[in-house]
Amino acid sequence: MARIHARRRGKSGSKRIYRDSPPEWVDMSPEEVEKKVLELYNEGYEPSMIGMILRDRYGIPSVKQVTGKKIQKILKEHGVEIKYPEDLKALIKKALKLRAHLEVHRKDKHNRRGLQLIEAKIWRLSSYYKEKGVLPADWKYNPDRLKIEISK
């Protein structure tokens, strides 16, 4: 696969080993893993970071193998509402930081171009999430409104 806004190939990465049951070294029960996921979310971690913490600190290679559910589903079952998908939220935060930079440094042409590329990714991703029903159909990218919502 190639990159969206660059003329180069992507990076190859390692593949996860196929297994249909949790490894024998995992000593936490599914209930304990769910409790740990909620605890980490309440500490302020995003779902991807929760998975990395569980992998690195607790030796759980995959939450889905242990519990049978993804982290998002565990959070949803316990009444946690995630307003924006994590990848979209990260792009919005990046765009807002770049806008703040461009307010101070108005002639920074290179970063103005970078902002255009980031916002193109946001529009592309938001149209995908609108099709899938994750975002409302009338949702629009408005940086001024999102600055307030994302900062909460």
Swiss-Prot record:
GO biological process: translation
Biased composition (Basic residues): 1-16
Region (Disordered), start-end ranges: 1-21
CDD domains in the cross-refs: Ribosomal_S15p_S13e
Keyword Ribonucleoprotein: yes
GO molecular function, one term: structural constituent of ribosome
Cross-referenced SMART domains: Ribosomal_S13_N, Ribosomal_S15
Keywords recorded for this protein, A-Z: Ribonucleoprotein, Ribosomal protein
Keyword Transport: no
Region forming the signal peptide: none
GO cellular component entries: cytosolic small ribosomal subunit
Family: Belongs to the universal ribosomal protein uS15 family.
PANTHER family in the record: RIBOSOMAL PROTEIN S15P/S13E, SMALL RIBOSOMAL SUBUNIT PROTEIN US15
Subunit structure: Part of the 30S ribosomal subunit.
Annotated protein name in UniProt: Small ribosomal subunit protein uS15
Natural source organism: Archaeoglobus fulgidus (strain ATCC 49558 / DSM 4304 / JCM 9628 / NBRC 100126 / VC-16)
Name of the gene encoding the protein in the UniProt record: rps15
